[in-house]
Amino acid sequence: MTLVLKFLKRQRAVARCGAIILLACSASLSAEEDATEVFNFKVSLDNREVGWHRFVVQTEGDQLTVFSKAKMDFTVLLVKKVSYRHEATETWLGDCLQAFESETERNTKRVFMSGSMKDGDFYVNRNEEEVLVSDCVRTFAYWRPAWLDDEFLLNVETGKYTPVSLEVTDDRLTNMTKRVVGLPKTEIHLAYDNSGNWQTLESDLKIAGTLRYQRINESVGETDAKL
């Protein structure tokens, strides 16, 4: 009888250890699935620093939330001063956008944009009207380069669903992957390191000059609860 009791106690102890190991493994997998990525960029215009742009990408299982905030001050044609402020929040499920809100201020003009999924389709609220866009919408998600490969991308600042093209090349000299997003009137040049992390952005702006984003390690922007 004593041997039987010892055997049962040993079995219960093994079961408890197994349960603890299983919980530890589950916690580890959950930690891998849930992650936060921060992208801080110094912004320059014609090689002159004009501000910053910050992206925080939070992943929880299949859901992804992106908070972005930008601040830029520059002069156009040596005369016109431009003050630019922008904030946006995007919610994704898998690789399809579920909702977004944005607020953009240029000097004294402020623009609000939003959109969301309804009954399997994505609608953008534009000029106090709901505009049907598509069933699976992607934005200019530079932080997820694979999502740029689409026929149209949504600009969350303007609410426009823009036709795009994509070219991808590998630069052996720098070990960077270059992606060029083609738009109707310009191009956006992006560079990623060999781990797929976004490092730079460059685009020619009409009248204003060449806009360039350079990723930096230090934090940028004012203190913000979300950012």
Model regions: which residues?
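Amphipathic/hydrophobic helical signal segments and adjacent flexible N-terminal regions
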Residues: 2-4, 224-227
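Bacterial N-terminal signal peptides that target proteins for export
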Residues: 3-18
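Residues marking helix boundaries in flexible regions
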Residues: 21-22
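N-terminal signal peptide c-region/cleavage motif recognized by signal peptidases
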Residues: 25-28
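Solvent-exposed helix/loop surface patches that form functional interfaces
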Residues: 34-36, 98-208, 213, 220-226
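N-terminal mature ectodomain segment of secretory-pathway/periplasmic proteins
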Residues: 35-117
